[in-house]
């Protein structure tokens, strides 16, 4: 699963998911992509599950680009722990996604196959997505 090798700070603030994506909202590498329509914290597990689904569908044909990276750590306290005593340890990693952000790009795959791959991939994501082309 994806996670950064090192970060400047171990435990970032939560922040808020307001507005639409101003960066990462256009196709750069491939001719077709999967675009997020809702804001979310996308976990590294969800990104990996989606990647596996797409690669299983297209097999060795074409090229896939992952346009998101989980660079924000989410901390959590152990269960049945009393409040206080500082912030919990980093539990997992997320990518902050705003509406309009391109999640995956693909190229060199037939129309039927890429539609099927992105359709099956969208079931692995907890948000609404849109299939876009150049």
Curated annotation (Swiss-Prot):
Gene Ontology cellular component list: chloroplast; mitochondrial large ribosomal subunit
Xref: SUPFAM superfamilies: Ribosomal protein L16p/L10e
Domain of life per record: Eukaryota
GO terms of molecular function: rRNA binding; structural constituent of ribosome
Record flagged with keyword Ribonucleoprotein: yes
Key words, A-Z: Chloroplast, Plastid, Ribonucleoprotein, Ribosomal protein
InterPro entries, per database record: Ribosomal_uL16 (IPR047873), Ribosomal_uL16_bact-type (IPR000114), Ribosomal_uL16_CS (IPR020798), Ribosomal_uL16_dom (IPR016180), Ribosomal_uL16_sf (IPR036920)
Locations listed in the record: Plastid, Chloroplast
GO BP term, example: mitochondrial translation
Main location: plastid
Subunit text: Part of the 50S ribosomal subunit.
Similarity remark: Belongs to the universal ribosomal protein uL16 family.
Designated name of the protein: Large ribosomal subunit protein uL16c
Organism: Guillardia theta
């Amino acid at each position: 699963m994806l996670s950064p090798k090192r970060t400047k700070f171990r435990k970032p603030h939560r922040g808020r998911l307001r507005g639409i994506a101003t960066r990462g909202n256009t196709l750069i590498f491939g001719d077709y992509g999967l675009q997020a329509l809702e804001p979310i914290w996308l976990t590294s597990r969800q990104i990996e599950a989606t990647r596996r689904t797409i690669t299983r569908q297209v097999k060795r044909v074409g090229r896939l680009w992952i346009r998101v990276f989980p660079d924000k750590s989410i901390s959590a306290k152990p269960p049945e722990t009393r409040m206080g005593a500082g912030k919990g340890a980093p539990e997992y990693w997320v990518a902050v996604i705003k509406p309009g952000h391109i999640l995956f790009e693909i190229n060199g795959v037939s129309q039927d196959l890429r539609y099927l791959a992105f359709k099956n991939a969208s079931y692995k994501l907890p948000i609404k997505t849109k299939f876009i082309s150049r």
